[in-house]
């Protein structure tokens, strides 16, 4: 059957060897120094992808990963999530600790984002208006415990 999941917690900087693992369904590349996601672009079987605490900003290699249901992008250098607009199977998106993220327009353009989905926005600079707009789609928007945004679900 081969490998279907990998867990990384090492000092990884180059993920190009992963490009050949096209049947992976779960990948965790947490707390590394990954700056280029291009090798992931062909991993079209991925359902869960965790990329927390790296150093990338460009999400365009994820554009074609249409089977993704869970995507964790916590603690990176993300300012633009436009490539996520076509990931219609996403059910949970974690964007925490991306303080330069100010717009989530791509989520409004994504027809798959809606009732029952979860979007984590703690420690971003997404406006209350955008958070409310997302909540109006039936999305559970998670934000700071003491957020001034009325529609957000507070997390501890």
Residue ranges of predicted features:
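Concave beta-strand-loop units of leucine-rich repeat
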Residues: 1-35, 39-57, 61, 66-79, ...
């Amino acid at each position: 059957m081969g490998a279907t999941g990998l867990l990384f917690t090492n000092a990884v900087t180059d993920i190009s060897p992963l490009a050949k693992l096209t049947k992976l369904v779960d990948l965790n590349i947490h707390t590394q120094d990954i700056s280029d996601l291009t090798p992931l672009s062909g991993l079209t079987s991925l359902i869960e992808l965790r990329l927390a605490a790296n150093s990338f900003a460009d999400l365009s290699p994820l554009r074609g990963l249409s089977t993704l249901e869970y995507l964790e992008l916590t603690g990176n250098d993300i300012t633009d999530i436009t490539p996520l607009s076509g990931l219609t199977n996403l059910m949970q998106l974690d964007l925490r600790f991306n303080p330069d993220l100010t717009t989530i327009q791509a989520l409004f353009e994504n027809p798959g984002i809606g009732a029952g989905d979860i979007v984590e926005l703690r420690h971003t600079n997404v406006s209350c208006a955008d958070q409310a707009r997302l909540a109006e789609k039936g999305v559970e928007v998670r934000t700071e415990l003491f957020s001034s945004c009325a529609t957000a679900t507070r997390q501890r």
